[in-house]
């Protein structure tokens, strides 16, 4: 998560240098803010998955009931997650970002660095979103990558 804050700070600095193209900068800045919110929501969901995963593996419990099959528990938890407001907001942010990103491809030359930085942030957030959308791997790799 710290990476997103550092990258956002770099993006802000680069954006200041691109002030000749105000409309593009506003759209780029808005998109960066949306990506940051998407990352926050994704992180909240992945942390919830990690907690559930650990509890099933170490305590053999899911939702207050005895459970030894963590795959079954994760599937049930995923069914629960997709009904939450957090997940619904995440999907809305995701859809909005995916609609806006292609519009940013045609950037002014003075905003090339800002655009490239945004694409880098977006790629990292995309991976985090995929982990929030569908947990995969082992608990160890999942918690390390998220």
Task: List the model feature ranges, each with a label.
Residues 1-16:
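Sec-dependent bacterial lipoprotein signal peptides
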Residues 6-8, 26, 51, 144:
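Intrinsically disordered, low-complexity regions enriched in small/polar residues
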Residues 14-16, 56, 119:
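Extended aliphatic helical segments
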Residues 18-82:
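Immediate post-signal-peptide N-terminus of mature secreted/exported proteins
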Residues 60-146:
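Long, amphipathic, charge-rich alpha-helical segments that form helical bundles/coiled-coils
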